[in-house]
Amino acid sequence: VAGGRPHPRDRPVTVLLPAAERVAVAWKNGGGVTREIAAAPPGADMAAFAWRVSLAEVAADGPFSAFPEVERTLTLVEGAGMDLTVGGRRRLVDTRYVPQDFPGDVPTDCRLLGGPVVNLNVMWRRGGAAPTVAVVRGRLRLPAAPALVVALDGGADLAGVRLGRYDALLLTGEDTVLHAHGPTAVVGLTPARGLAALTHDERH
C-alpha cells in the first residue's frame, strides 16, 4: 500500500493509511477522480486487483467506468446523491452511509442530484470472496479477522490510533475495540491472496 505505515505504538499487524498521502487519479473515462485507500495484491493495476477500496469524487453527470468481471459496493459519503441507471434500471442513491451493491461491468449512467459527490467504492473480482461493507457508529468490538476501517466523518479511535476524516487502518490480526465518533466504514476482508503481502513490507 503506497504510504502505508505501522503506528509506532502498535503491533505490526496494523497499518495506518493516512488520507493526506493519497494521490488523486483520473477515472479511465475521465468522469471523475479516485483516491485508492488499499488494494490487493500490492501494486496491482485496475485489471489485476483481487479487491480494491477507494474514495471516488464525481463532479459531473455521465457514465461510470466499466470493470469486466468485477462486483462493487458503493456508499455515498458526501453530497446530495446520484440518480443512477444500472443496466437500464433506475437506482436512486440519495442517502449517505448506506452501502449499495451492483455489478461493475453493467453500463451505469449517473445524474447528480445536487452537485458533486464522494463515494466509498469497494470492488472485487467476481467469483472471489466478497468483502462485507458496514457503516457503524459508537463502540464495538471487531473480531480477529482482516478488515479495513475508514473514518468517514467525526473520526475514530482503535488499536491505539486516532483516525481523522478519511484516514484508514488495515487490521490483519487480533480483536480490537473501535470507538467510532461518527460514521465509520468497516470493510471485512477475507484472507484473500495478496493480503499478507499487503502488510509484509510495512512491518517492523
Could you describe each region identified by the protein language model?
Residues 2-204:
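Jelly-roll (double-stranded beta-helix
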